[in-house]
Amino acid sequence: MAMTTTNNNRAMTRAAKQALPALGALATSGMGQQLFMSGVNYAIEKGKQFVPNRRGGKKNRNTDMVAHPGALSGSMAAPVAISRIVRGSKPRFIRSKGSVTITHRELVGQFNSSSALVVNGGITGNLYKINPANAVLFPWLQTLASNFDQYMFNTLRLQYVPMCASTETGRVAIYFDKDSQDLEPVDRIELANMRHLTETAPWCEGSLRVPVDSVKRFMNDNSTVDPKLIDLGQVGLATYGGPGTNAVGDLFIHYTVTFYEPQPSSGLTSTLQTGTGSANAGPTLVAVATTATTTTVTFRSPGTYLVSMVQRATTFTGVTPIALTFNSNTNTTAAGTNYSANYNVTVPVPGAQMRFVGTGFGNYTLQVTRAKITNAATLL
């Protein structure tokens, strides 16, 4: 076999050597410089189409929106299909001398559409006071907060995540009020006058950053004359302009909070009583309204609960569930004097109710605590 020792491309090599001087002359000429700059500009324009602009380390959101004729600056166009991936949140703990700092995210609840203005699912009474001891706003954090005397929020943010179609009509608003005792807005004018407010369509995600300060406040674990001294404020979610009462989205709360001054646990069970010497204790998980024939227990937060009711009554007919599920129960009656009802219930949305029915209803003692379905209330 013969081995090739010569370069068969000598003709091409000679042609390349002859072309190099011509290319150099073209590159230094005016036309060559113009061609070079045209190529640079072309590369820059192409890069803008694929690389998002960065300003101050943050993504320029204007590059993510679809241009629509007639749309004003800052408006959002309804997408064909888009969703938020919600992943599990891992709590982060940082210990220092005399304090512990916690960063976490929690689900506050699911909210439904409404035609008229509905705030906090129709539950009144400053439902979402910003205090770690408020089990309605901080169902997970409250179990830790009950072991401390003081707190200070470092960051706090509300996030609305839609779960409805992009054809859903209406509005969703989330707001912050510095005064935890102010009444909820009763109309759209009052809502629009909120200093800290985010409004959006039901299908569009919304976020509201709550202003925080560097003030240590006390936990709300007992009766307080002026709640303004212990609460950072209150937040709320309002819906209006919708076609029905279907679910539109979830509300999440993100926070970093520091706890100070450990104490014996203040308890996790809500106790409500009427009568001479009565005393309420624990977190406010429910509201109670009673007449001579009915006692209605309204839940302020979703979850699974163990409910124990003892009430004076002439007769006891039973318990009616309203927008909640009975998992297990046991009822007993002492004819003509009182009844006892123990229930394990699952509450999907704020405002769900249990209605106790009978005659001659009087004083009661009600115990409510968060539980699992396996905490059965059945008498075997």
UniProtKB/Swiss-Prot annotation:
Q: Would I find RNA-binding among this entry's keywords?
A: yes
- Record's Gene3D superfamilies? 2.60.120.20
- RNA-binding among keywords: yes
Q: GO molecular function of the protein, one example?
A: structural molecule activity
For the region S domain, virion shell, what residue ranges are annotated?
99-259
* UniProt xrefs under Pfam families: Viral_coat
Alphabetical UniProt keywords: Capsid protein, RNA-binding, T=3 icosahedral capsid protein, Virion
GO CC terms, sorted: T=3 icosahedral viral capsid
InterPro entries (alphabetical): Capsid_prot_S-dom_vir, Viral_coat
R domain, interaction with RNA: annotated segments: 1-98
Q: Where in the cell is it found?
A: Virion
Where do the segments described as P domain, projecting lie? 260-380
Q: According to the UniProt record, where is the region Involved in encapsidation?
A: 54-59
Source organism superkingdom: Viruses
Please describe what this protein does. Capsid protein self-assembles to form an icosahedral capsid with a T=3 symmetry, about 32-35 nm in diameter, and consisting of 180 capsid proteins.
The entry's family comment says:
Belongs to the icosahedral plant coat protein family.
Q: How does it assemble?
A: Homomultimer.
- Name of the featured protein: Capsid protein
Where does this protein come from, organism-wise? Answer: Cymbidium ringspot virus
